[in-house]
Amino acid sequence: MSTPSAAPACVIGHIAVRDQAKWVEYRDQVAATLAPFGGEVLFRGRKARVLGGAHDAELTVVIRFPSLDAAHGWFDSPAYQRLIPLRMAAADVDLVSFSG
């Protein structure tokens, strides 16, 4: 049986953009930070309809990594950490990692 860190993992982001220009600047720089950790954007889209509960974010992104360790390595990397102030100025973002 695989250990949790060996299972594929995803980072899911729920995003409410406050400054479109800063958001585009941030978004355009993220891809380069994903590659060293095997990350790839699986889905990026706008909210179509809430089917149950509440969901205020307008955008959702799903990023796949080969493992939870890789996902956390990406988030903790100096390259991504440098982008966080720009992300915080651009949008309200909830990021959650999942393994499985």
Locate the predicted segments by residue.
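C-terminal structural segments of small proteins and small subunits
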Residues: 68-96
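Short S/T/G/P-rich N-terminal loop/turn motif that feeds into the first structured element of a domain
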Residues: 1-59, 66-76, 99-100
